[in-house]
């Protein structure tokens, strides 16, 4: 596609809660424990993609449009009901929260590779990552013309069939597609298909669809928003306090300070199980109800966890 489509594309992110839940839970913990921390981080394209001309300009325009977002009373009411573990002061903070386009700036080099630099307080920029990734993903489909060829009816059928396969075979599943989606509409279609499949086959399924990471879509379909934390929380602490040695210990302590026993599934593998095990005391093992396996062989990791406990 030609550069002149930049500037004509509608706003991609239209709701403050069109984001993954764990960005809000981590933002709350960061504000509570590290309100003055300054961060700098960079977008990395693992595939070294060459983006169309004008792509970075449109990314910047879409980031600028985020400044218009304001959390609504309906969004806050939903989160207070479903995300009861988030302290009420956080919603007061969110009522006054506004994005600033200066926190993230995109550019392209002469070869067309995309660069995005994030700068600012951790408490503020933490709510940009997933939204910016969703913008990049959707714009890529628009700029390459793939979005115009998308068959939404077929996609619904495929999503419904996938849900049926998992649910009929006893799987417990949730949807985590915000940063990877081809568009907000396609993610909504996928979540809707999973919801409908679960409802239509309620007497036959042995599995369950427990929710989505996307808070806005959870509100739209009245399901549970899913998520606790990302590696970012542990790695950010490691960056501030001298590396991985005590990062898990401090992350668990700060998480407990904010959530007082709620949200007790800990993401342990930022620096591997052995480093985590050095920091996981008996009190931590008793207070965190579960561990999230996010790397390595699941069975091998599960055996390590069982032996440790």
What are these model-derived regions, one by one?
Residues 1-251, 256-258, 282:
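Ordered alpha/beta subdomains of enzyme catalytic regions
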Residues 224-304, 308-309:
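Glycine- and Gly-Pro-enriched alpha-helical subdomains that act as flexible
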């Amino acid at each position: 596609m030609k550069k002149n489509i930049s500037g004509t594309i509608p706003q991609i992110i239209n709701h403050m809660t069109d984001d993954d839940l764990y960005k809000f839970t981590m933002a709350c913990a960061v504000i509570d424990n590290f309100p003055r921390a300054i961060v700098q981080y960079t977008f990395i394209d693992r595939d070294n993609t060459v983006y169309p001309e004008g792509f970075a300009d449109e990314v910047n325009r879409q980031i600028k449009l985020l400044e218009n977002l304001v959390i609504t009373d309906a969004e806050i009411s939903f989160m207070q009901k479903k995300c009861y573990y988030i302290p009420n002061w956080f919603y007061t903070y969110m009522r006054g929260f506004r994005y600033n386009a200066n926190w993230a700036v995109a550019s392209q080099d002469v070869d067309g590779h995309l660069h995005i630099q994030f700068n600012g307080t951790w408490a503020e920029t933490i709510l940009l990552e997933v939204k910016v990734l969703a913008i990049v993903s959707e714009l890529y489909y628009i700029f390459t013309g793939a979005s115009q060829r998308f068959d939404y009816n077929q996609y619904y059928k495929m999503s419904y069939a996938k849900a049926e396969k998992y649910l009929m075979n006893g799987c417990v599943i949730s949807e985590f597609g915000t940063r990877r989606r081809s568009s907000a509409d396609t993610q909504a279609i996928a979540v809707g298909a999973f919801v409908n499949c679960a409802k239509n086959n309620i007497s036959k399924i042995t599995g369950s669809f427990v929710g989505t990471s996307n808070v806005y879509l959870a509100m739209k379909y009245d399901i549970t928003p899913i998520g606790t934390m990302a590696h970012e929380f542990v790695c950010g602490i490691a960056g501030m306090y001298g590396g991985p040695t005590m990062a898990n210990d401090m992350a668990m302590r700060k998480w407990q300070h904010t959530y007082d026993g709620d949200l007790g599934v800990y993401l342990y593998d930022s620096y591997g199980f052995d480093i985590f095990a050095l920091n996981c005391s008996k009190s931590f093992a008793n207070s965190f109800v579960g561990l999230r396996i996010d790397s390595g062989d699941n069975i091998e990791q599960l055996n390590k966890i069982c032996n440790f406990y």
